[in-house]
Amino acid sequence: MNYQNDDLRIKEIKELLPPVALLEKFPATDRAAQTVSQARQAIHQILQGKDDRLLVVIGPCSIHDTEAAKEYASRLLALRDELKGELEVVMRVYFEKPRTTVGWKGLINDPYMDNSYQLNDGLRLARKLLLEINDSGLPAAGEFLDMITPQYVADLMSWGAIGARTTESQVHRELASGLSCPVGFKNGTDGTIKVAIDAINAAGSPHCFLSVTKYGHSAIVETSGNGDCHIILRGGKEPNYSAQHVAEVKAGLAKAGLPQQVMIDFSHANSSKQFQRQMVVADDVSQQLISGEQAIVGVMIESHLVEGNQSLESGEPLVYGKSVTDACIGWEDTDKVLRQLAAAVKQRRG
């Protein structure tokens, strides 16, 4: 009797474009490569305490419309140039969305937002957009969710995040150990920081794991470890951005033998999922900077051209420049918050 025990729940398997095909079609220009290299170096210097500016990762919760993303990028670039003495501004360019249950998983997974899952098209769109943003002189940041996607886009990322749901995952810690950019680990969804501290230690060490080559072949990868990893406070059961929370995290980092560096996410549980409250967090963090707090090295902000968010399920035409995932602050508040942070950094210098 023949027993069929394999692929019982697999509906379809399609070939994925090898990374090299995309890298050859959309090669990094000298300008884009320079943007990435200089931003990574600047972030490294901030993490080393050799640059007293503030790292600001700001942008849409997720990218669903590349035209709106390009307009946002051009506006942000002007502010980056104006405030570069105080801030290292990097655009949040998130193509993949980890979901607590189900939902749209982002531009790479489902670029046409119709459950057609044209991943090859999604990867093309993502790399092309990243190339255009970096080519303009604006560095980009992203979240890494799997071991394969980085081969298509990681050379154009100046900073990376490992999210709250994946910080505890061994696979993501191994991935971070081999990424060429600095990486932030979020505290756990319950607010605990131990998982992030463990992740920083793990990612700083060498690892050996399975991945794919640029030619799309299965491979054994050995890494040297990533010394540019840090914690991101995103709240949990309650917010954790206050001076008291920062002091507690500093103590935890010191106890673990890690540098006392903290990045604060203004959104997620720190804003209690209310996008306007990001401005309240900004006020508090600015005060901490003005008071001379050196441990705060960076912030994350969810912002778009139009404030709020909209549902993909509503059947209504989509509003240009408005998030389809988490609600974001709009452009007016974006301009305001960046200027506020720059002023706070100036005052921190004394």
Describe these PLM feature segments.
Residues 66-78, 101-109:
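Glycine-rich loop at the start of a catalytic domain that most often binds anionic cofactors/ligands
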Residues 59, 264, 330:
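Conserved, mostly hydrophobic/aromatic
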Residues 55-68, 326:
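Conserved phosphate/anionic-ligand binding catalytic regions in large, soluble enzymes, centered on
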Residues 18-27, 223-235, 318:
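Gly-rich Lys/Arg/Thr-decorated short loops/hinges at beta-loop-alpha junctions or inter-strand turns
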Residues 2-6, 86-241, 245-246, 268-269, ...:
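Active-site-facing alpha/beta catalytic cores
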Residues 47-50, 78-84, 128-137, 222-223, ...:
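Acidic (Asp/Glu)-rich catalytic clusters
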Residues 304-347:
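Internal helix-turn-beta structural module
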Residues 8-48:
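N- or domain-start disorder-to-order transition segments that initiate the globular core
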